């Protein structure tokens, strides 16, 4: 008689599933694990959002009534003042990731009320989880969406190697003090992590190597499992399908962009796509590099249409002679995003650091080649001159050349792009890897 397989209960924790790459990635993994049904059952626990059968929210576990709202407001104000005092010596940074409010004090109780065998952490900052509240009697999987888990205070360490030691004198804090905030937070993480059964997952080989070299995670169980996406949603469409969609699109700007992109060969300018959420304020997004590359192309008389989503014209000053610029604003509709990917001849992702970019994966799955710098996890997804172009790091001239190369080989490289994503990043492929990990840890 076959032995009954016990279902492994997984609680996946992320601050939200609606905004940001980490939330989208976490939700896709959650859905995938439940879909493949290989002995694992995932439930999500989020800070903000709407409660569903498989999604619990922190609000469900907070005290109800006006007294709590008022008390929470007062305590938050006090804690914010303390937080500002902590950060005041470090004027160079605007990072507020270590703020916490009264809600954090209810989290431990909320976690204890959940039934699970494995706790799966994703992105837990923004006043959500205090590491000292993590359970010491359960295996914890922590998927790295940036470097904060193994750094003192930094989400992106850039050229700093302090995380390989004990942090301190943090360049991102503008500090020369070896016992600065980054060192103090590092010590607290070290104290807590030594009590936890941590298993680290990195979506990219690059970040996994960084984690292995870090003083906080050295010697830990560190594995590489990529993020995933629904390749049935993010898929290529024919030119005729794009034209039909454009005719029924209520957004006049998007409709025009799609119609222009599908004109007969010789009439349509190549379409360069750029996603620019927070690009003006976040230098990590690499907008300065993109601007330099486009200026190089413009001086060469290169004609193209640049389509920007996620930012407005007032956010990004773009003015060229030969390259027209269209802003389509913030795109919350996934289907609309898919059509934009399909219309593009190339998507440019000029970020200065990347783990495993959702935008790159989504565009590749739609059959759109990528031009990006050869940094971080980009090389895991983009194969140079096969499904995109890996420009030399910080070399804007090479980035400009890569944009031209992607446009020239758009059809050929786009087909290879789609094939690579289906093979490595489809939901069932990735979910099975996580299901096997859960089973291993829950024995």
Kindly give the residue locations of the regions a language model identified:
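Carbohydrate-associated surface elements
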Residues: 206, 228
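Short alpha-helical donor nucleotide-sugar binding micro-motif in glycosyltransferases
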Residues: 339-344
């Amino acid at each position: 008689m076959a032995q009954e397989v016990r279902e492994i209960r997984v609680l996946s924790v992320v601050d939200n599933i609606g905004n940001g790459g980490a939330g989208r990635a976490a939700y896709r993994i959650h859905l995938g694990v439940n879909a493949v049904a290989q002995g694992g059952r995932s439930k999500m626990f989020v800070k903000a959002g709407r409660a569903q059968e498989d999604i619990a929210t922190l609000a469900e576990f907070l005290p109800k009534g006006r007294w709590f709202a008022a008390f929470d407001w007062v305590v938050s104000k006090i804690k914010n003042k303390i937080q500002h005092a902590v950060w005041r010596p470090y004027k160079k940074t605007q990072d507020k990731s270590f703020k916490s409010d009264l809600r954090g004090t209810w989290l431990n109780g909320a976690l204890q009320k959940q039934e699970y065998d494995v706790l799966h952490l994703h992105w837990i900052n923004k006043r959500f989880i205090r590491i000292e509240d993590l359970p010491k009697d359960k295996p914890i999987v922590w998927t790295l969406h940036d470097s904060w888990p193994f750094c003192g205070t930094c989400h992106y360490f850039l050229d700093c190697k302090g995380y390989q030691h004990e942090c301190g004198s943090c360049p991102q804090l503008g500090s020369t003090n070896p016992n600065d905030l980054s060192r103090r937070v590092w010590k607290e993480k070290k104290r807590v992590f030594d009590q936890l059964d941590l298993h680290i997952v990195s979506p990219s080989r690059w970040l996994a190597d960084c984690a292995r070299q870090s003083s906080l995670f050295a010697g830990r169980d560190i594995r590489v499992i990529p993020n995933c996406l629904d390749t049935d949603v993010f898929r290529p469409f024919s030119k005729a399908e794009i034209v039909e969609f454009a005719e029924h699109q209520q957004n006049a700007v998007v409709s025009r962009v799609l119609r222009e992109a599908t004109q007969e060969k010789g009439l349509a300018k190549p379409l360069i796509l750029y996603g620019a959420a927070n690009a003006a304020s976040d230098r990590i997004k690499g907008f300065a590099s993109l601007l330099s590359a486009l200026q190089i192309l413009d001086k060469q008389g290169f004609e193209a249409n640049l389509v920007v989503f996620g930012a407005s014209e007032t956010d990004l000053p773009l003015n060229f002679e030969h390259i027209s610029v269209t802003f389509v604003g913030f795109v919350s509709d996934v289907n609309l995003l898919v059509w934009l990917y399909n219309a593009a001849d190339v998507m440019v992702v000029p970020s200065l650091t990347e783990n495993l970019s959702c935008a790159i994966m989504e565009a590749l799955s739609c059959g759109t080649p990528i031009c990006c710098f050869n940094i971080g996890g980009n090389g895991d997804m983009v194969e140079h001159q096969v499904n995109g172009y890996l420009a030399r790091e910080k070399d804007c001239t090479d980035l400009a050349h890569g944009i031209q190369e992607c446009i020239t080989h758009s059809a050929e490289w786009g087909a290879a792009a789609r094939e690579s994503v289906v093979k490595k990043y489809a939901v069932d492929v990735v979910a099975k890897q996580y299901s096997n990990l859960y089973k291993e840890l829950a024995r």
